[in-house]
Amino acid sequence: LFNEKTVKYIPIHYVLSRYPSXGLNYYQHRLAALINNQFMPYPYYAKPVAVRPHAQIPQWQFLPNIHPPTVAHHPHPRPSFIAIPPKKTQDKTVIPIINTIATAEPTLIPTTEPIVNTVVTPEASSEFITSTPETTTVQVTSPVV
């Protein structure tokens, strides 16, 4: 099925004549196209080679870039890479400068531990006396419906 079939080469002037936006040019200008455009083989072309069984695959050759494209494609940065400047406030308030290099001092958190009485009276024994808060129990009766 694939014996003796040649690979067709589309000349660049034919591609330019198909698009009326290019106009009539005396020079061989290339259109700015995407790399993955399947309809315009921009810097690569296939050599016309007869395809036979066990034949070598046609090699892709690089065309010399005599006429560079007129449109330069710049990469579009993603929103995560764009630096947004802070908003300027209308009123001129002085912002106090906070020293971020200073060491952070730990804040003391009050704990709810029982208070230990360490005062020793001569009449008392040598044991520590712990005072616990007094609790009162109140019986709550719910009305039965």
Swiss-Prot record:
Keyword Glycoprotein included in the entry's annotation: yes
GO cellular component: extracellular space
GO biological process, one term: protein stabilization
Assigned keywords, A-Z: Glycoprotein, Milk protein, Phosphoprotein, Secreted
Site positions per UniProt: Cleavage: 81-82
Phosphothreonine carried by residues: 121
Glycosylation sites: 107, 112, 118, 125, 141
Localization (cell): Secreted
Residues bearing PTM Phosphoserine: 125, 142
Role of this protein: Kappa-casein stabilizes micelle formation, preventing casein precipitation in milk.
Family in the record: Belongs to the kappa-casein family.
Protein name: Kappa-casein
Source organism of the structure: Balaenoptera physalus (Fin whale)
Protein's gene: CSN3
